[in-house]
Amino acid sequence: MSERGDDDRTTSTINSLAKRRYQDNLDTFQEERAGFQQKRPHAVDDEDEDFETAAPPTKQKTKAEEMMERMGYKAGEGLGKNKQGIQEPVALSTQRGKTGLGHEGAKAVARDMNEQWDDSTENKTVEETVIWMTDIDEGIRREICDKLIKDDQWMVVRKEKKVIDDETEFCSEKELKDMIEAKNVFDSMSDKDLREARTRANPYETIGSAFFQNRAAMKTANMDKIYDWILSRENTGNNSFLLKNPLQEGTTAENVDRHEDLFYFADVCAGPGGFSEYMLWRKAFYNAKGFGFTLAGKDDFKLQKFTASSAYFFETFYGTKKNGDVMDPENIDSLEKFISEGTDGQGVHLMMADGGFSVEGQENIQEILSKRLYLCQLLVSLCIVREGGNFFCKLFDIFTPFSVGLIYLMRVCYDSISLHKPHTSRPANSERYITCKGLRKEFAGVVKDYLKRVNRKLDELKNKNSKDDVMELMPLDVIKSDEQFMKEIIEHNEVLAHRQTVYLQKYKSFAKNQGQFDKDQGNLRDECLKYWQVPNKQRPRGGDRGSRNGNQERLNPNVVLGKYTSKICGEAELGISFRGLGAASDPQLLIGTGDAVFIYRHGHFEQIDRDYARIPENTILLVDCAEEVKTDGSKIRISSDPHMIRIADAAVLYGDNVSQLPYEARMKAAQKFALALKLTKKTIQIGWGFRAKDITPHQVCCAQTYSLKELDEFQSNLIELKQRGEVIVLFKEGDRQFKTQSLRLTRIIKQDWQMGWSKSQQVPYVHSPLHQKEGSILEDQWKKREIHSSFWDSVILTNKDKQKMTEMMQHGHNAVPSTIWSWKPCMRTEYGPYKIMNHPEAFDGKPTISAIKSQIAETDLSTLRSKYTPLTAL
């Protein structure tokens, strides 16, 4: 408070000084100007003071004044026979818009430069307190569900209603009447005048959209904070989550949630996607996967405007009808199935809904017009949210038994619910949000089925053009019998109705006097963003495309590679690695730059269409482009889908630099990255309208890894087939199959070190002839001593590395790089897939699975060793 008081005093002082300086300059100017009134200044001598100053010349009458005199006009009197004409000049018009002269509505908002708003009627705060409604008793939950299972008698159908001013069961008549009257005043104002008054009057207006694509994103940020982060499920204990999204510009972000499970959310009726852009930004990197469902067409998601995060972690769906209509029963069923498939049957952690449509000219009955939208959004949450998951949804007025009945049923389905209007929701509208915490599947399933039946009934009445409507979802007396709920819902409605009335009156005052503006807007913006833990910055115009350096990074793979690699090498050295894996060619370095995806082939980078390779910017991977194989008995068919992009190793995952982590940790992060990019449906739609088309992009998956101790498990996933006399070995990876071309054995420690097994400690250790002073280093010290082989050590073999490795091999220092065990058949020898799979010992000095397993068993027996050396089936 003292800082703000100091700021006010400083501002007042500056204003006072400015006024004084202005007056001094004006006086000086007038004094100097007096000497330039004549071309030749009058010479002043001592005698001039004795003469009287000549009177100014008489002003000549204008033609208009002469005409007025002839009509009998005299100064101070009016025209007319009885001098009844007006004497004062005609006043400036206070008329607004095109409303007729004298219209009562026009008079109510007529211009008045003396109009002043009383700030004391407002309560401007940064922090907000949300109120959770009293939880419903478990016994009542069961009673209601039992009633809904038996029949649909609670569903009341009668003649539709198009007025709201008599809905006083859940709000006092006075508050409702005052609010409606305040709304009616603006019917005579143009949209332009109303928007202009709102911009100056709303104390939180300048918060805007910050660096997101629209204001909806900031609503989510606002709600996330005041509900103690239950929406994004951020762990805010020690503020470590801020490392993912630093508040200070220029600070490097750190993925502290790399080891957390993937966060799933759904964004329903929320185009163009501000909710989702915030959630992907807040979770950061590849920690979240979103599903979107909204109307197709002009109100669709604007994925190209996702600049705070990558839209590749967001998958859209439009239902069976492909129109995104959430009120269509078939679309709801297909969305439920889609989300189940995309989340392995679990559902999303969070559903967000922001549905609405224009009710121009019918603002007072917005609740009645939106009742089915209310129903379907809340119904979808019961279909797709997982056990214990959360949900929030935009509502408007809730005065009717239908709306209040819906809210009551949400209390049955969730542990707790809350109704709240955040600061970022403009105060003069009836918008508010229902937030539901902790879904209870036991009860939600029953209510879901009931609401689906209600929606089908509404659909039936609509298709028949019936004048009837579903007016109640549960008896009014059942709701009223819950006295605590009635008290809370009435209090909520009256508080919001009063606040809305106050701000409608403020808009009216600011519309009258256009010189008024809310002086707290700038200060509130800064303090709110700080409180919500959102950086105070603006959205860049044109994104990075307005910057030459940004363009280089978005289009040049070498620029991205140079940001992260610790090795200096030429392009020719990138290909010196190892032979093919699941494909016929070498494994390839893939780099995502933002505007393009590049793969290193044949000694140079080749660009892939980014619509088909959905890889976000700042990504560096070692990949195997493999064809998926379909089988029909003994027949083998290559899938017609584009090649799979299989991750064999990872350096950078959407800006998360994992290159220095141990190989197993890198691959675990890559698995999460691939899961976030996974498409539930193989095809996606790009464009809309007549430009819309369906495409099948490359699927991204992570190659499965095994240690040599897991050869039995690996072998169980192999399928041996004969085709045209040739043995072909397929390996299963999830629900897919690939040809086994070779195995990649990855070195997990740096080239300088050799691994051993401590019999006394029963743990691995390393030692090195080149670092004898270091002695033996046990496994728990490897990370601290940087023993693990990095991505760059494994993938990029520079000429200097080759020379060092050759010298080590010459001195018998066991220089074994990451290598490939080829399984391809050879025309000159019988060695191939069949011998590798079935021969009981080494064949012609070459390894087989049985020979390796025997060697491992012997080593285990002598050292009691239990693990290590991962291999990848590729």
Swiss-Prot record:
Residues 1-10 have a biased composition (Basic and acidic residues). Its EC number is 2.1.1.57. One of its GO terms (biological process) is 7-methylguanosine mRNA capping. GO terms for cellular component: cytoplasm; nucleus. GO terms for molecular function: mRNA (nucleoside-2'-O-)-methyltransferase activity; nucleic acid binding. Residues 211-440 form the RrmJ-type SAM-dependent 2'-O-MTase domain. S-adenosyl-L-methionine binds at residues 273, 354. The keyword Zinc does not apply. InterPro entries: G_patch_dom, mRNA_Cap_2O-Ribose_MeTrfase, RNA_MeTrfase_FtsJ_dom, RrmJ-type_MeTrfase, SAM-dependent_MTases_sf. It comes from the Eukaryota. It is an enzyme of class 2 (transferase). Signal peptide: none annotated. Residues 60-106 form the G-patch domain. Residues 1-64, 535-555 are annotated as: Disordered. Pfam families: FtsJ, G-patch. Keywords: Methyltransferase, mRNA capping, mRNA processing, S-adenosyl-L-methionine, Transferase. SUPFAM superfamilies: S-adenosyl-L-methionine-dependent methyltransferases. The active site is at 394 (proton acceptor). It catalyses: a 5'-end (N(7)-methyl 5'-triphosphoguanosine)-ribonucleoside in mRNA + S-adenosyl-L-methionine = a 5'-end (N(7)-methyl 5'-triphosphoguanosine)-(2'-O-methyl-ribonucleoside) in mRNA + S-adenosyl-L-homocysteine + H(+). S-adenosyl-L-methionine-dependent methyltransferase that mediates mRNA cap1 2'-O-ribose methylation to the 5'-cap structure of mRNAs. Methylates the ribose of the first nucleotide of a m(7)GpppG-capped mRNA to produce m(7)GpppNmp (cap1). Cap1 modification is linked to higher levels of translation. This is Cap-specific mRNA (nucleoside-2'-O-)-methyltransferase 1A. It comes from Caenorhabditis briggsae.
